[in-house]
Amino acid sequence: MQLKRSFFIMAFAISALTIQVPIFAADAELPVVFTEDFEKGSDSWEILDPNTWKLSERQGNSTLEITKRKSEYQPEVRSPRHIALIKDVEVEDFELTFKVRSTKDTGNHRDCCVFFAWQDKTHFYYSHLGAKPDPHSGQIMIVKDAPRKALTTNETRTPWTDKWHHVKVTRTASTGEIVVYFDDMEQPHMQVSDMTFKRGRIGIGSFDDLNEFDDIVLRGK
């Protein structure tokens, strides 16, 4: 009887520890450091070519939109031309979510870009959500004093339509892990690990296409 009682107490203790694990994980969720719905304008953004972006309103909802494919911003090395960076925020670990609508079908390289660990105009990562992947489209890229270079060999198409889509990008600086999601928030669209850059700024945009953005939430530290 004593042996059975001791076993029961031990099993209960182990069970209690197991139950507490998800609670600990929830507590570890990164804090929200920035949100944007553009209802009060775009003053929180540094736009590298303001003449190709505008605030738009449809049915009472405000968005930020790229309106011209050609940009006056000409980067020193081959890399995206439409870039809007969040002001006064730098993160190392982060989770970025937002809605995006591609407003022009430009074919295989129809895209949206997400910028992160931005140091300056020639040092940063970006995710290129191109419709058809190749070495210059549909990959996680690095810019480091040279034209953009793919870190991934992704072969999964980005299924653009004219409707709104959901994007999530996560980064764990301690391991270098970068994970990108498109519509399906459980199954990664592409992922890689790289330790070149850690803390930096976050941005949205496109290589040279037209997009509309809304409902941006950045969690990070």
Regions found by a protein language model. Name each.
Residues 190-215:
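Flexible glycan-contacting loops in extracellular carbohydrate-active proteins
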Residues 42-72:
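Extracellular glycan-recognition surfaces and repeat-rich motifs
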Residues 9-22:
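Bacterial N-terminal signal peptides
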Residues 145-166:
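Short, aromatic/His-centered strand-loop micro-motif at the edge of beta-sheets
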